[in-house]
Amino acid sequence: MILIIYAHPYPHHSHANKQMLEQAGTLENVEIRSLYHLYPDFNIDVAAEQEALSRASLIVWQHPMQWYSVPPLLKLWMDKVLTHGWAYGHGGTALHGKHLLWAVTTGGGENHFAIGSHPGFAVLSQPLQATALYCGLKWLPPFAMHCTFICDDDTLQAQARQYKQRLLAWQEVNHG
């Protein structure tokens, strides 16, 4: 099962993420957990989140990039849900062997993340990759949708279909 942990503080303002979720939602065996919908008060149900993670073979962290990082509720989710003795540390093997895909949208162009005046995209992914590896997850190459503020609907739809194809390809290789 693919579990999408979706974290967007303003989901109604994001055409890109909405289209990505719509495309992913057409696939079989996909569960979408919208953190800002489930936890508007930031009071995370750790047991429910761990149970959902236990059922997944592929975990997707989908969110807009905010200040070169994750939205605050996703960071809190990581702090609360990925606990010692469950996700890492002595006895913490619940996530071992599962795959993790980082699916991120950005307002800036891909060249904005080239090494130079701004950090490279690979550098920005390092904290998430380190978290994944520390929890025994298998890090997959990220899926990034850039320029989402200025893309027309056709471009956003095409990129959202690429996202769906990426998930479908993973399903075909890992479950069939």
Curated annotation (Swiss-Prot):
The keyword NAD applies. InterPro entries: Flavodoxin_fold, Flavoprotein-like_sf, K_H_efflux_KefF, KefG/KefF. GO terms for molecular function: electron transfer activity; FMN binding; NADH:ubiquinone reductase (non-electrogenic) activity; NADPH dehydrogenase (quinone) activity. Its cofactor is FMN. GO terms for biological process: positive regulation of potassium ion transmembrane transport; potassium ion transport. It is a peripheral membrane protein. Its EC number is 1.6.5.2. Its main location: membrane. It is found in: Cell inner membrane. It is an enzyme of class 1 (oxidoreductase). One of its GO terms (cellular component) is plasma membrane. It catalyses: a quinone + NADH + H(+) = a quinol + NAD(+); a quinone + NADPH + H(+) = a quinol + NADP(+). Keywords: Cell inner membrane, Cell membrane, Flavoprotein, FMN, Membrane, NAD, Oxidoreductase. FMN binds at residues 8, 14-17, 65-68, 105-108. Homodimer. Interacts with KefC. NCBIfam families: PRK00871.1. Belongs to the NAD(P)H dehydrogenase (quinone) family. KefF subfamily. Regulatory subunit of a potassium efflux system that confers protection against electrophiles. Required for full activity of KefC. Shows redox enzymatic activity, but this enzymatic activity is not required for activation of KefC. This is Glutathione-regulated potassium-efflux system ancillary protein KefF. It comes from Salmonella typhi. The lineage of its organism: Bacteria, Pseudomonadati, Pseudomonadota, Gammaproteobacteria, Enterobacterales. The gene is kefF.
